[in-house]
C-alpha cells in the first residue's frame, strides 16, 4: 500500500462511505446487515496476505496480467502532437477490464460462504466476466440484463449462456443497465441469505465503490510502474472512458497524488448534450440512485431519465461517487464525446494501429484525438484501452450501413 498523507486524494471514502457529499449507503433495511457484513469481510480480506496472494495469482495466471503498456507510433504520427500510449486491458481474459473486479469479488463471496452469484450487465462484458469466474469456481450465476441490451449484445448473451449463466432479460423502464441493476437489487433483497451481488462498476452502496476501485486499481499500479520503467517518468495526461467509471478510477487512483499528472474522464455525449446522451457529470445533478448519492440524469421532478450512447457500457444514467467528488474538487477534468466522434475514433485506431477497440474506449480515443494535437511532442498521453471491439462489430456495421 502507498503511504497515506493527511492531504492525500487517495484516503477516501470515510468510514461511512462518503467522498465529500457523495457516496454513502442508502439501502433497504433488509440489506443493511449484509452491506455491513460485506464491509467487515472486505476490511478483513484487505488485511489478509493470503487473500491478496490468491487475487494476484489469479490475475497473473488466469487473467493474463500485467497487461502491456503500448506506444502507438502511427496514431501519434497521425495526430501530430503528444506521444500516445495505451494500457492494453482489452488483452485480459474475457476482453475487458471487468474481470479484475470479478476475481476480487468472487473471492470475497466465497470467503463469506455465499453459494449463489448475481450481477447486472449493460454491454454484457461484466456479465461475461461474472459468468466466467462463476464457472471457474463452480457457483451458480444469474445475470440481469436489460431487454434492449440483450438485443444489441447477442454475442455476449450467448457467451454467458455457454459459461453456464442464466440470463434474465429485464423489460422494465427502457430495458437497459439501470433497470437491470434495479432488478438485481430486488433479487438480492429476496435472497440475501445465500446470494452475493457482484456489482460491475464503482457505484452502488458503500463499500462497493471502494472495493471495485481497489480491485481495478491494478490497472493504474501496473501502468505507473511500466511507464517509469519504459520512459523514466510519469505521463502528463491520463484519459479513460466513463460509464459508471470503474476502468477510469482504476487507472486514475494510483496517480491522484502526483500533481504533474492531469486526468481526463470521457463521458458519452450520445447524440449531443442538448439531445439524448449519458453524460451525468456534464448534464446531470446530484441525487440518489442504487444506494449512493452522485450525479444523475434526471428530469425537473427528479425522475431518473434514460441515458443514451452507441456504447451499451456507457449509457448508465449515473456515475461512481468518487468521480463526482473528483470533479467537484477539480482534481480530474471531465469531457464528453458523441456517438459519431466515437465511431470515427474506433475506425482510426483500427486503421492506424491494427487494434479493434470496444466502443467504450473509442470514446477515450476520440478525446485523445482532440487533445493530442494541442500538446507538445515530448509530452505523454496514457489512455486506457479497457475493452476489445469483437462484441461491437455488429452495431458498428449497422451504424456504417453495412449488413453482416
UniProtKB/Swiss-Prot annotation:
Its cofactor is pyridoxal 5'-phosphate. Keywords: Amino-acid biosynthesis, Aromatic amino acid biosynthesis, Lyase, Pyridoxal phosphate, Tryptophan biosynthesis. Belongs to the TrpB family. One of its GO terms (molecular function) is tryptophan synthase activity. SUPFAM superfamilies: Tryptophan synthase beta subunit-like PLP-dependent enzymes (SSF53686). Tetramer of two alpha and two beta chains. One of its GO terms (cellular component) is cytoplasm. The gene is trpB. This is Tryptophan synthase beta chain. The beta subunit is responsible for the synthesis of L-tryptophan from indole and L-serine. CDD domains: Trp-synth_B. The lineage of its organism: Bacteria, Pseudomonadati, Pseudomonadota, Alphaproteobacteria, Sphingomonadales. Its EC number is 4.2.1.20. InterPro entries: Trp_synth_b_CS (IPR006653), Trp_synth_beta (IPR006654), Trp_synth_beta/beta-like (IPR023026), TrpB-like_PALP (IPR001926), TrpB-like_PALP_sf (IPR036052). Pathway: Amino-acid biosynthesis; L-tryptophan biosynthesis; L-tryptophan from chorismate: step 5/5. PANTHER family: TRYPTOPHAN SYNTHASE, TRYPTOPHAN SYNTHASE-RELATED. It comes from Novosphingobium aromaticivorans (strain ATCC 700278 / DSM 12444 / CCUG 56034 / CIP 105152 / NBRC 16084 / F199). The modification N6-(pyridoxal phosphate)lysine is found at residue 98. It catalyses: (1S,2R)-1-C-(indol-3-yl)glycerol 3-phosphate + L-serine = D-glyceraldehyde 3-phosphate + L-tryptophan + H2O. Pfam families: PALP.
Amino acid at each position: 500500500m502507498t503511504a497515506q498523507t493527511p492531504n492525500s486524494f487517495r484516503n477516501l471514502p470515510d468510514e461511512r462511505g462518503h467522498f465529500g457529499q457523495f457516496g454513502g449507503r442508502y439501502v433497504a433495511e433488509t440489506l443493511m446487515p449484509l452491506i455491513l457484513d460485506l464491509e467487515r469481510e472486505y476490511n478483513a480480506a484487505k488485511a489478509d496476505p493470503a487473500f491478496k496472494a490468491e487475487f494476484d495469482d489469479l490475475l497473473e495466471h488466469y487473467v493474463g496480467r500485467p497487461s502491456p503498456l503500448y506506444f502507438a507510433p502511427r496514431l501519434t504520427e497521425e495526430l501530430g502532437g503528444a506521444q500516445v500510449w495505451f494500457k492494453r486491458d482489452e488483452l485480459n481474459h474475457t476482453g475487458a477490464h471487468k474481470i479484475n473486479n470479478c476475481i476480487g469479488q468472487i473471492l470475497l463471496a466465497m470467503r463469506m460462504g455465499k453459494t449463489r452469484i448475481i450481477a447486472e450487465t449493460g454491454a454484457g462484458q461484466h456479465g461475461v466476466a461474472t459468468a466466467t469466474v462463476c464457472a471457474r469456481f463452480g457457483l451458480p450465476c444469474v445475470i440481469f440484463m436489460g431487454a434492449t441490451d440483450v438485443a444489441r449484445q447477442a454475442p455476449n448473451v450467448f457467451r454467458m449462456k455457454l459459461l453456464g449463466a442464466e440470463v434474465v432479460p429485464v423489460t422494465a423502464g427502457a430495458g437497459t443497465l439501470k433497470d437491470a441493476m434495479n432488478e438485481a437489487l430486488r433479487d438480492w433483497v429476496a435472497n440475501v441469505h445465500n446470494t452475493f451481488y457482484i456489482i460491475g462498476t464503482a457505484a452502488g452502496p458503500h463499500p462497493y465503490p471502494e472495493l471495485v476501485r481497489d480491485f481495478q486499481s491494478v490497472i493504474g499500479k501496473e501502468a505507473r510502474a511500466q511507464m517509469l520503467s519504459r520512459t523514466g517518468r510519469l505521463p502528463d495526461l491520463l484519459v479513460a472512458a466513463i460509464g459508471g467509471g470503474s476502468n477510469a478510477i482504476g487507472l486514475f487512483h494510483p496517480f491522484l497524488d502526483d500533481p504533474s499528472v492531469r486526468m481526463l474522464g470521457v463521458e458519452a455525449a450520445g447524440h449531443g448534450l442538448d439531445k439524448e446522451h449519458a453524460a451525468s457529470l456534464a448534464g446531470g445533478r446530484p441525487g440518489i440512485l442504487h444506494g449512493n448519492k452522485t450525479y444523475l440524469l434526471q428530469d425537473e421532478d427528479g425522475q431518473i431519465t434514460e441515458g443514451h450512447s452507441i456504447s451499451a457500457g456507457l449509457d448508465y444514467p449515473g456515475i461512481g461517487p468518487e468521480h463526482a467528488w473528483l470533479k467537484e474538487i477539480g482534481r480530474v477534468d471531465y469531457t464528453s464525446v458523441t456517438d459519431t466522434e466515437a465511431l470515427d475514433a474506433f475506425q482510426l485506431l483500427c486503421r492506424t494501429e491494427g487494434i479493434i477497440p470496444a466502443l467504450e474506449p473509442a470514446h477515450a480515443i476520440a478525446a485523445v484525438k482532440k487533445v493530442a494535437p494541442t500538446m507538445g511532442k515530448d509530452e505523454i498521453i496514457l489512455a486506457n484501452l479497457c475493452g476489445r471491439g469483437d462484441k461491437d462489430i455488429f452495431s458498428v456495421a449497422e451504424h456504417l450501413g453495412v449488413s453482416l
